[in-house]
Amino acid sequence: IQAAGLVLEGNKVSVNAVNKLYKREIFESLRFPVGKLSEDAFIMVKLLAGVGRAVLDTRPKYYYVHREDSITTSKYKPKDLNVIEAYTGNREFVLKNCPQLNTQADFRYFWAHFYVLDKMLSTPGFKKDGDFKRIVRTLRSNYFNILRNPITGRKRKIALTGLMLGSWLYKLIISGHFKSKRRLVG
């Protein structure tokens, strides 16, 4: 269960199935969903919550290259909503089976909404549709829950506060428009 929590936090362990070793028996009852983006996210929490022992080694042994125009770096498409679907399922699973991970599951659930919203707003010509409005509504209605979550970073909390005023301000904040500029004195 602790390993599942680390995956949900996303600092030391990624949700990706690559760079991990598994016993064959684990996959007798679990299958990756077909036709979904972020298919790893659909099963990794259930998988790790169900194992008796997990070993973590943070030494780099696998080097992942982010290609421009890969699935994770491409412009927004409706299939990106699969990320929210995956972490909604994880959140429900955690609530029923390992409530001690609620903080981590909430963090990742909201992270998924931010991830998709960021992709939407960074896609030129994106039209604010029903999915956009639903994501913004979810984040706004959980404003205080997100602010109280100790895993959510300061910059994300500031961006969320901007979203409360308008998506235009949120977009300015996440695009780095307000980066601090240091002046040299002397």
Where are these regions (language model features)?
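Donor-binding/catalytic cores of nucleotide-activated saccharide
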Residues: I1-V55, V65-P78
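Catalytic-loop motifs flanking and including active-site residues across diverse enzymes
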Residues: I43, A86, Y109
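A structural signal for short, well-ordered beta-strand segments and their strand-loop junctions
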Residues: V55-D57, Q104
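All-alpha amphipathic helical-bundle segments outside canonical DNA-binding/catalytic cores
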Residues: L101-R108
